[in-house]
Swiss-Prot record:
This is U8 snoRNA-decapping enzyme. PROSITE patterns: NUDIX. It is an enzyme of class 3 (hydrolase). Belongs to the Nudix hydrolase family. NUDT16 subfamily. One of its GO terms (cellular component) is cytoplasm. Its EC number is 3.6.1.62, 3.6.1.64. RNA-binding and decapping enzyme that catalyzes the cleavage of the cap structure of snoRNAs and mRNAs in a metal-dependent manner. Part of the U8 snoRNP complex that is required for the accumulation of mature 5.8S and 28S rRNA. Has diphosphatase activity and removes m7G and/or m227G caps from U8 snoRNA and leaves a 5'monophosphate on the RNA. Also catalyzes the cleavage of the cap structure on mRNAs. Does not hydrolyze cap analog structures like 7-methylguanosine nucleoside triphosphate (m7GpppG). Also hydrolysis m7G- and m227G U3-capped RNAs but with less efficiencies. It comes from Homo sapiens (Human). Mn(2+) 3 binds at residues 76, 80. Binds 3 or 4 divalent metal cations. Acts specifically on U8 snoRNA with magnesium as cofactor. Has broad substrate specificity with bound manganese or cobalt (in vitro). Its cofactor is Mg(2+); Mn(2+); Co(2+). Expressed strongly in lung, kidney, adrenal gland, testis, heart and brain.
Length: 195
């Protein structure tokens, strides 16, 4: 990831008190739906439009009162997504990666949690009633996992948006590693260079 150095979780947790930890989660669910009756959706993946106009994943900074990274992440998910986020819990087994950037002393931890489609739909339905809606979070968006016939519409165009930090790279890595796209789809994408 551009400008970021990957750390093992143990190394990240041993950095000491001068470091802040931020945790974010990619929430996804299998989706049997079809766009226009012919384009398979495959999975629903949630991202959010942030207060700064950039796309990112739900989550935030872990506070000192949180007993673990996951406790802090689950608290943040309830604040940003609403009470439907209390129906599931992101666990250590959902952990994907940790990165530090060249800027402030912040470690970014990334998780991916598979939900049922019903759980994901409940999160979407309740998100506008969440504590942080309209403040830190301006709304949820789904990631289009298809490419239209023009070769540009869908995921390639979505990737042209402005993303916070490493969110774009985390998304692409998760799509590939979790098998959320059809085999070979990422290598065949006309992915514009990161702005």
């Amino acid at each position: 990831m551009a400008g970021a150095r990957r750390l093992e979780l143990g190394e990240a947790l041993a950095l000491g008190s001068g470091w802040r930890h931020a945790c974010h989660a990619l929430l996804y669910a299998p989706d049997p739906g079809m766009l226009f009756g012919r384009i398979p959706l495959r999975y629903a993946i949630l991202m959010q439009m942030r207060f700064d106009g950039r796309l990112g994943f739900p989550g935030g900074f872990v506070d000192t009162q949180d007993r673990s990274l996951e406790d802090g992440l689950n608290r943040e998910l309830r604040e940003e997504l609403g009470e439907a986020a209390a129906a599931f819990r992101v666990e250590r087994t959902d952990y994907r990666s940790s990165h530090v950037g060249s800027g402030p002393r912040v470690v970014a931890h990334f998780y991916a949690k598979r939900l049922t489609l019903e759980e994901l739909l409940a999160v979407e339905a309740g998100a506008t009633r969440a504590k942080d809606h309209g403040l830190e979070v301006l709304g949820l968006v789904r990631v289009p996992l298809y490419t239209l016939r023009d070769g540009v519409g869908g995921l390639p165009t979505f990737l042209e948006n402005s993303f916070i930090g490493s969110a774009r790279e985390q998304l692409l890595e998760a799509l590939q590693d979790l098998g959320l796209l059809q085999s070979g789809s990422i290598s065949g994408l006309k992915i514009p260079a990161h702005h």
